């Protein structure tokens, strides 16, 4: 029993759990369990009453709802580190911002360079710009204490800025219409959160109440609802009026739910991709090459190059006691686009099978390449 407890509480166990549920999902989707798996996550669940109802399939409740809690945790951790921790210095926090810019611009340019002659294919230019923060964090968890905290923070920070960029891209290029009323309600909720923070109110129930309304409004607005989690995190006070730690306590309470329940469930719901109808030959189509080269090469080169230039221009600084070799390994992991890339792919091509699933296969190949190469590289390089 003591051994099991030690294993569960180890730093690597959440990563192992995430990888296990990823492969379990792939197994279910590509076996006789495929129909049961699909029906389970596509089953509709309705919450509300009369005219105030939200009806969504289980996988969307997970992707739009539970993952917002994950983003809340990431936002809280980032806020704490910026105000009290290792990112207090403006040059330290600017590093992941430059990295995120490079990690979006370079893959997009690679995809465009390969697919510029094909109008429909060009709709997917944003597919390789995304980083799946959940899976990238999962790989880091597998590495345990081999990765310094400063590098973990860099990846978390970069992934948040990257996902904020993805949300902006989705809102500008892949949203059919935005609801003005829902956006106004979002602004009212943000104002309410601002007041709660200004008066240093630390009743968690009030933040939950306003947060739920904000999430619903965000859901109805056309903007990705996970942004609500990041917004809420900005307004959670660092301390109580008596100067006792508050934000850190909230984070400590949420963290076990995220790493042991939300992330494994997210992996199980999203990693189920049917690869039986995919042809390996399609990997060499322009769309596939654009995605694979964009995610696997474009991401790591873009993040590293932009960060390197920013450091040399003294606009940012490398974390203390970190060498460029180890830093590059983290850059490789940013190429894990997986579920975020699949999400943008669905928006771009409207879930069309015109490419015979070559686009989805390319996302899988690039993401697994980034994960495996990044993991091995970080294991070897000191």
Curated annotation (Swiss-Prot):
Q: Name one GO biological process term.
A: regulation of pH
Catalytic reaction(s) noted = Na(+)(in) + 2 H(+)(out) = Na(+)(out) + 2 H(+)(in)
Q: Which GO terms describe its molecular function?
A: sodium:proton antiporter activity
Task: Give a Gene Ontology cellular component term annotated to this protein.
Answer: plasma membrane
Q: What is its main location?
A: membrane
Query: What HAMAP family does the record tag this protein with?
Result: NhaA
Entry-linked NCBIfam families: NhaA (TIGR00773), PRK09560.1 (NF007111), PRK09561.1 (NF007112)
Q: Which PANTHER family is this protein grouped with?
A: NA(+)_H(+) ANTIPORTER NHAA, SODIUM ION/PROTON ANTIPORTER NHAA-RELATED
What is the name of the protein in this document? Answer: Na(+)/H(+) antiporter NhaA 2
The organism encoding this protein is Campylobacter jejuni (strain RM1221)
């Amino acid at each position: 029993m003591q051994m099991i407890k030690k294993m569960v509480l180890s730093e690597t166990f959440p990563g192992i759990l995430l990888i296990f549920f990823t492969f379990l999902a792939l197994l279910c989707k590509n076996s006789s369990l495929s129909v049961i798996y699909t029906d389970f996550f596509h089953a509709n669940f309705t919450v509300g009453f009369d005219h105030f109802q939200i009806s969504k399939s289980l996988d969307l409740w997970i992707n739009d709802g539970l993952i917002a809690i994950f983003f809340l945790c990431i936002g809280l951790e980032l806020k704490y580190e910026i105000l009290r921790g290792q990112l207090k210095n403006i040059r330290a926090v600017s590093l992941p911002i430059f990295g995120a810019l490079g990690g979006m611009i370079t893959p997009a340019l690679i995809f465009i360079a390969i697919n510029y002659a094909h109008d429909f294919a060009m709709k997917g230019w944003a597919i390789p710009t995304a980083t799946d923060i959940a899976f990238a964090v999962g790989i880091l968890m597998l590495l345990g204490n081999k990765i310094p905290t400063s590098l973990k923070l860099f990846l978390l920070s970069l992934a948040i800025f990257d996902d904020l960029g993805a949300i902006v891209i989705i809102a500008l290029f892949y949203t059919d219409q935005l609801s003005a009323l829902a956006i106004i309600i979002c602004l009212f909720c943000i104002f309410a959160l601002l007041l709660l923070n200004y008066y240093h109110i630390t009743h968690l129930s009030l933040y939950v109440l306003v947060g739920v309304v904000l999430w619903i409004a965000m859901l109805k607005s056309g903007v990705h609802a996970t942004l609500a989690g990041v917004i809420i995190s900005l307004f959670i006070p660092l301390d109580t009026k008596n100067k006792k730690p508050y934000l850190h306590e909230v984070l400590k309470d949420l963290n076990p739910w995220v790493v042991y329940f939300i992330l494994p469930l997210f992996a199980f719901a999203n990693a189920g991709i049917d690869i039986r109808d995919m042809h390996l030959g399609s990997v060499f189509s322009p769309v596939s090459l654009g995605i694979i080269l964009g995610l696997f090469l474009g991401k790591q080169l873009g993040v590293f190059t932009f960060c390197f230039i920013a450091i040399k221009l003294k606009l940012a600084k490398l974390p203390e006691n970190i060498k460029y070799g180890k830093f590059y390994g983290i850059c490789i992991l940013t190429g894990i686009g997986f579920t975020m890339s699949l999400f943008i792919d669905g928006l771009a091509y409207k879930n069309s099978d015109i490419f015979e699933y070559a686009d989805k296969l390319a996302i899988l190949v690039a993401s697994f390449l980034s994960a495996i190469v990044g993991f091995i590289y970080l294991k070897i390089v000191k």
